[in-house]
Amino acid sequence: MNRFITSILVVFISMSGWLQGADTGSISGILGMRDFQSRFADRYNPISNSYSYSAWRQALLTGTINAGCLFGAMLSSPFTERIGKKYSICFFSGVYIIAELLLVTAVPSWIQVLVGKILAGVGIGALSVLSPGYQSEVAPPQIRGAVVATYQIFSTGAALVAACINMGTHKLRKTASWRTSFGINMLWGILLMVGVLFLPESPRYLIYKGRDEEALRIMCNMAELSPESEIIQTNFNTIKSDIEIEMAGGKARWIEIFGKDIRYRTCLGFLVMLFRELIGNNYYFYYATQVFKGTGMTDIFLPAVILGAINFGTTFGALYTIDNLGRRNPLIFGAAFQSICFFIYAAVGDRKLIYKNGTSDHRAGSVMIVFSCLFLFSYCCSWGPMGWVIVGETFPIRYRSKCASVATSGNWLGNFMISFFTPFINNAIGFKLGYIYACINLFSSFMIFFLAKETKGLTLEEVNDLYMSNIKPWESYKYVREIESHRIHFSKEEEKREREKSKGIRGQEEEFIENADEDNNDSSSSSGSVVSAVKPRRSAVSNDRFSEDSHPTYI
């Protein structure tokens, strides 16, 4: 398996994000379908011949999936430690498939829909921990951030596709309108479960389990280098020594992730993922219909498609920001800009969108849509993908699965709070809710400045060293620059030594060949002399390299 194919497969694991986006992106449209409402809504208006949901029923149908995600995120750790990330991803993909099957066959009980959404949440929550963690362990550090960011790209892409599917199926007769959406979601789960079987296991997990030869082979395939390569040997020995040091303390217990050396990172990961949701990105998708109606638009499915397209298109900006602007700056300035967007959105919505006589100001609605789109652009280039990157690369291997579970549970806790409580709060204060989100974004900006350290381009082992040091978060970029400078210098020195040693070997070969010709030896014996003379030299060169005390070059 060459490097390109393996890289494609590592990106393919972001299909886990596709499952999340497909499920969350389809439910709002499905709830608005006439046939679905007639079967599962709890309110009927005979005058208008229409169905609707009570606040409690709507909160349960939209919010309980996040409760399932919270449970699934915590459940992923014991599975990872027992069977590894690869087969854990396969297992929880199966859980998601079963959940979608329950949803497809949910007639006429709304309780079955509720159970199906909770079970789907368990699968999605576990996959949201496993997939970014797997990608962080397998991807090279130079592109690790971009690879993990593809999780968010897949998620937003799936939400757009789901909105388009809903728009195309909502006019179908009877149950086909919503069963089609659930059925297609089930196909995505099958695709992931089958595809993951072709992925290599994480080398760090294999070394952790004592399967060194298998780990070394996978590392060689990923880098397209031989096992004797200094880069491979250095990386392998670094990972192995770090694992041995970490495992010297025995199997990590849950209480240890709140111990002195690790609780800072545990809390940081949890807070980043919690505020990733509390800053209000999903609010726009839940209440886009109201805003778009203010502009005169009546199609309830079109707003989801428009916002989904913006959400998906702008997420590609994260591929640039993550590995060029780093981790801290996009989060700090992104949240500050989002605070401004929400403040203007709330002010216009509260004062201008709806008049007392019930009419709406189309210009006010247009302004709100513009700032909704600006918010989504900023979010998709910063907080959207960056949370998964931080969770994937911040924790040491001994605690990684447990810390990632706790951190990701913050994401689903925040999502649950938004989806469950927003209907009640919005009914009470309307667009003033935007002021609250503006304050949360501003707080998030300061939180990142004082807590998160810059980790752009660092290996997972260097990230661990950084957080174990006393370097202040706002000074951590200096550490990153020093590491990058040292790495570039080492690479140039290594290339220079390789050229010099290669010249020396060629000179020896020519000398031996000339001596062999003078002695009138046959071609076969001459060849044997050259090989026997060169091989020890290559071995000596290799040994000399590993004796040097120099900073490693990482793949």
UniProtKB/Swiss-Prot annotation:
PROSITE patterns: MFS, SUGAR_TRANSPORT_1, SUGAR_TRANSPORT_2. Residues 522-534 have a biased composition (Low complexity). Residues 510-521 have a biased composition (Acidic residues). Glycans are attached at N357. The keyword Ubl conjugation does not apply. The keyword Transferase does not apply. CDD domains: MFS_HXT. Residues 492-555 are annotated as: Disordered. InterPro entries: MFS_dom, MFS_sugar_transport-like, MFS_Sugar_Transporters, MFS_trans_sf, Sugar/inositol_transpt, Sugar_transporter_CS. Residues 31-58, 109-112, 166-179, 286-301, 350-363, 426-432 are extracellular. Residues 1-9, 80-87, 134-144, 201-266, 323-328, 385-404, 454-555 are cytoplasmic. Keywords: Glycoprotein, Membrane, Repeat, Sugar transport, Transmembrane, Transmembrane helix, Transport. GO terms for biological process: carbohydrate transport; gluconate import across plasma membrane. Residues 492-509, 545-555 have a biased composition (Basic and acidic residues). GO terms for molecular function: carbohydrate:proton symporter activity; gluconate transmembrane transporter activity. GO terms for cellular component: plasma membrane; plasma membrane of cell tip. Pfam families: Sugar_tr. The chain crosses the membrane at residues 10-30, 59-79, 88-108, 113-133, 145-165, 180-200, 267-285, 302-322, 329-349, 364-384, 405-425, 433-453. It is a multi-pass membrane protein. It is found in: Membrane. Belongs to the major facilitator superfamily. Sugar transporter (TC 2.A.1.1) family. High-affinity gluconate transporter. This is High-affinity gluconate transporter ght3.
